């Protein structure tokens, strides 16, 4: 679960991290009043969406008068911001962050993730702030410095100092960076985060460090013990189909294609999308119904897939290991009958009770295309979309 920048900075303040004074506003009038509270300009106004690339899309602007703040708010509030990280529809803008502008001398990067390889929280710091860290990692990996947090002893000040020295900081900046490092690490661990980024972490003209931007991602599996973070959730930033799927413990990710995919198992789901693409098709989604697929969950999965107007065919690919294929067949038959599917449905069953499942599908009398192989199923669903 992602948080907005203004929410991240509210948490930063509680953990002693320096950030510009700012206010999240929902109306143009509030935005003007926020500027008055902050004091003399210039100010920075930022659209609050769960996506990067806001600046290039016009969602971040430095302004020197309150009329420009009002104009920015009137232009964006209630609209959608499209960036390279959103889909073509963009993300809705419901808040504008107004904050004091900062005189920047240099931009740095500081972030942390859970490294599954080392099973540690790993901090990353770089002198290449203000750009995507993925790009830095690909082109100049030597510019990324890391510090792994030992889960038994927790973050240590010496780790912050080591990173500060590697970034070329000196004097009071080392102490400031160490304080930011310790505060951010404590925030990460206490709040069950999966990702945190300060990009950029800037050195001001006065030589001080300031967290100019903030991105936090919470571990969804730990939200049950983070009630405050749960209250910060913004459903408007989430795909409605993905939210519906989460209620049924279905793993769903919307894509841009026209072939709906329903599969059990994440690996098989990715392989299914690959083979659809290989044969000239385009997946409309990733959907993993998991090992506990029931008739009810299969029905909901069909509803979610078909709620996407782009879907022209559905590919069901089930390997029966834990789950029995005949029970999946019952679920498919019930779902097709209940939902009223009016697009071709190609089903490939393999494994536990696959023959019985295939017989049930054949005897159902419904417009379901049975496939006996993965390659054949992919070819059939692509042909169905093309009307062949």
From Swiss-Prot:
Catalytic activity, EC: 6.2.1.5
Free-text remark on how the cofactor is bound: Binds 1 Mg(2+) ion per subunit.
Superkingdom, taxonomy of origin: Bacteria
Residue ranges of domain ATP-grasp in the record: 9-244
Residue numbers binding Mg(2+): 199, 213
GO cellular component: cytosol; succinate-CoA ligase complex
Similarity comment: Belongs to the succinate/malate CoA ligase beta subunit family.
Protein name as catalogued: Succinate--CoA ligase [ADP-forming] subunit beta
Gene encoding the protein: sucC
């Amino acid at each position: 679960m992602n948080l907005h920048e203004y929410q991240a900075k509210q948490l930063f303040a509680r953990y002693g991290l320096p950030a510009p004074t700012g206010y999240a506003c929902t109306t143009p009038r509030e935005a003007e009043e926020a500027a008055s509270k902050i004091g003399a300009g210039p100010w920075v106004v930022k659209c609050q969406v769960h996506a990067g690339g806001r600046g290039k899309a016009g969602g971040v602007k430095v302004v020197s008068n309150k009329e420009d703040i009002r104009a920015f708010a009137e232009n964006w509030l209630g609209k959608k911001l499209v960036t390279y990280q959103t889909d073509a529809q963009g993300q809705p803008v419901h808040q504008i962050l107004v904050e004091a502008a900062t005189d920047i001398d240099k931009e740095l990067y500081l972030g942390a993730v859970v490294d599954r390889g080392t099973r540690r929280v790993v901090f990353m710091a770089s002198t290449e702030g203000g750009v995507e860290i993925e790009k830095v990692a690909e082109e100049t990996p030597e510019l990324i410095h890391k510090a792994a947090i030992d889960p038994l002893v927790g973050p240590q000040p010496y780790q912050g100092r080591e990173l500060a020295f590697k970034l070329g900081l000196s004097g009071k900046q080392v102490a400031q960076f160490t304080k930011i490092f310790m505060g951010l690490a404590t925030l990460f661990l206490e709040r069950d985060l999966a990702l945190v980024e300060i990009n950029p972490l800037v050195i001001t003209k006065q030589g001080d460090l300031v967290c100019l931007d903030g991105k936090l991602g919470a571990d969804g599996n730990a939200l049950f013990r983070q009630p405050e973070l749960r209250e910060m959730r913004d459903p408007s930033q989430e795909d409605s189909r993905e939210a519906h799927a989460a209620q049924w413990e279905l793993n769903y990710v919307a894509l841009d294609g026209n072939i709906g995919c329903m599969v059990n198992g994440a690996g098989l789901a990715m392989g299914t999308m690959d083979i659809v693409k290989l044969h000239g098709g385009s997946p409309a989604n990733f959907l993993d119904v998991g090992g506990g697929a029931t008739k009810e969950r299969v029905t909901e999965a069909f509803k979610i897939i078909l709620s996407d107007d782009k879907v022209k065919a559905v590919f069901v690919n089930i390997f029966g290991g834990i789950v029995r294929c005949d029970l999946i067949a019952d679920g498919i038959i019930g779902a097709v009958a209940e939902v009223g599917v009016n697009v071709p449905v190609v089903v490939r069953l393999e494994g536990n009770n696959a023959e019985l499942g295939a017989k049930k599908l054949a005897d159902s009398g419904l417009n379901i295309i049975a496939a006996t192989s993965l390659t054949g199923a992919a070819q059939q669903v692509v042909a169905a979309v093309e009307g062949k």
